Amino acid sequence: MKLLLLTLAALLLVSQLTPGDAQKCWNLHGKCRHRCSRKESVYVYCTNGKMCCVKPKYQPKPKPWMF
């Protein structure tokens, strides 16, 4: 039982220490990926050439035209 708990603790520690799946972008609200998910859209491109996938609620709203 102790070996099982030690193994689980080690796996939890390793999973917290390894970096995430994607680089952060757009003020930490987006992720740099090759493809965006359905709920995300591309607003800018990352420095590594990938797309910065951002959820629409974090993208700036377009301002109306002033005449």
Swiss-Prot record:
Has antibacterial activity. GO terms for cellular component: extracellular region. Disulfide bonds join C25-C52, C32-C46, C36-C53. InterPro entries: Beta-defensin (IPR050544), Beta_defensin_dom (IPR025933). Gene3D superfamilies: Antimicrobial Peptide, Beta-defensin 2, Chain A (3.10.360.10). Residues 1-22 form the signal peptide. It is found in: Secreted. Belongs to the beta-defensin family. This is Beta-defensin 36. The keyword Ribonucleoprotein does not apply. It comes from the Eukaryota. The keyword Signal applies. Pfam families: Defensin_beta_2. Coiled coil: none annotated. One of its GO terms (biological process) is defense response to bacterium. Keywords: Antibiotic, Antimicrobial, Defensin, Disulfide bond, Secreted, Signal.
